[in-house]
């Protein structure tokens, strides 16, 4: 896992039962990709459907991922919340933490994200922390400062396995992609920060996210310190998603 390329698809608020089943059945002919860890992050209501399909149809070749988790560690009067323990019950393996859309629409910042990280680790799941700067922050030359602040929640966590997705906010769903030089700079910086915060013996995966598609995936995977991709809209298409997986396998 920690020496593979990761390709994680984030469906966001998309999917229907019948459409999900159709996509899962297409994945039965998924090309061989031993060098790639593949995951799909579905809306919470479809996680059990996804997990069952992974077991029955795909022999666990694709991991089940959740898009979010509650900040509250225990069961209780938190209407609408889903705990890390509940996600574990659905067969979830990886949980996205801190996606920019959570910050944008729900005001989630470092303190909440740290609590979510701890909750996920406490039940044995893998958190995938999302970080990224806005266009205004990049134009002001503050991208390193912003990312360092977001990564600071990793300090002191009880884990030696760290997964981060770098998603420049200005490239999410916009069709814009950071240049190879920008991606290389930020991924090298993120590696350096993680080693500083968590120690030299930590295992690291740093994914790139931000309009990753079949036609640019190979170039992105060739960038130093890019360990995979967090894929948005392209993960809803079998052809696009498998093309990205193949690019990772061949990187």
Swiss-Prot record:
SUPFAM superfamilies reported in the protein's UniProt record: Triosephosphate isomerase (TIM)
Major location category of this protein: cytoplasm
Pfam family for this entry, one: TIM
InterPro entries, A to Z: Aldolase_TIM, TIM_sf, TrioseP_Isoase_bac/euk, Triosephosphate_isomerase, Triosephosphate_isomerase_AS
Active site: 99, 167
Residues the entry annotates as binding substrate: 10-12, 173, 211, 232-233
PROSITE patterns membership: TIM_1 (PS00171), TIM_2 (PS51440)
EC number(s) on file: 5.3.1.1
CDD domains linked to this entry: TIM
Enzyme category, top tier: isomerase
GO BP of this protein: gluconeogenesis; glyceraldehyde-3-phosphate biosynthetic process; glycerol catabolic process; glycolytic process
Localization (cell): Cytoplasm
Coiled-coil intervals: none
A GO term, aspect molecular function: triose-phosphate isomerase activity
Alphabetical UniProt keywords: Cytoplasm, Gluconeogenesis, Glycolysis, Isomerase
Gene Ontology CC annotation, any one: cytosol
Pathway it works in: Carbohydrate biosynthesis; gluconeogenesis; Carbohydrate degradation; glycolysis; D-glyceraldehyde 3-phosphate from glycerone phosphate: step 1/1
UniProt catalytic activity: D-glyceraldehyde 3-phosphate = dihydroxyacetone phosphate
Family to which this protein belongs: Belongs to the triosephosphate isomerase family.
Subunit architecture: Homodimer.
Function: Involved in the gluconeogenesis. Catalyzes stereospecifically the conversion of dihydroxyacetone phosphate (DHAP) to D-glyceraldehyde-3-phosphate (G3P).
Name of the protein in question: Triosephosphate isomerase
Source species taxonomy: Bacteria, Pseudomonadati, Pseudomonadota, Betaproteobacteria, Neisseriales
């Amino acid at each position: 896992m920690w020496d593979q390329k990761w390709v994680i698809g984030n469906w966001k608020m998309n999917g229907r039962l019948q459409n999900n089943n159709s996509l899962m059945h297409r994945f039965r002919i998924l090309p061989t990709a031993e060098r790639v860890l593949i995951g799909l992050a579905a809306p919470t209501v479809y996680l059990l459907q996804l997990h069952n399909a992974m077991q029955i149809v795909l022999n666990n070749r694709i991991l089940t991922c959740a898009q979010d988790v509650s900040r509250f560690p225990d069961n209780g009067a938190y209407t609408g919340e889903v705990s890390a323990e509940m996600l574990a019950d659905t067969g979830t393996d990886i949980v996205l933490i801190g996606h920019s859309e959570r910050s944008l629409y729900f005001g989630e910042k470092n303190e909440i994200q740290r609590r979510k990280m701890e909750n996920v680790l406490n039940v044995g799941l893998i958190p995938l922390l999302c970080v990224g700067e806005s266009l205004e922050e990049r134009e002001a030359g503050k991208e390193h400062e912003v990312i360092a602040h977001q990564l600071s929640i990793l300090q002191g966590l009880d884990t030696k396995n760290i997964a981060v997705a770098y998603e420049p906010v200005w490239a999410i769903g916009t069709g814009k992609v950071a240049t190879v030089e920008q991606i290389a700079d930020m991924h090298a910086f993120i590696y350096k920060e993680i080693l500083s915060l968590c120690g030299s013996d930590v295992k690291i995966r740093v994914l790139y996210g931000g309009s990753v598609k079949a036609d640019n995936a190979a170039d992105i995977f060739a960038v130093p310190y890019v360990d995979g991709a967090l894929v948005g809209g392209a993960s809803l298409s079998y052809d696009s998603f498998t093309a990205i997986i193949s690019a990772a396998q061949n990187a």
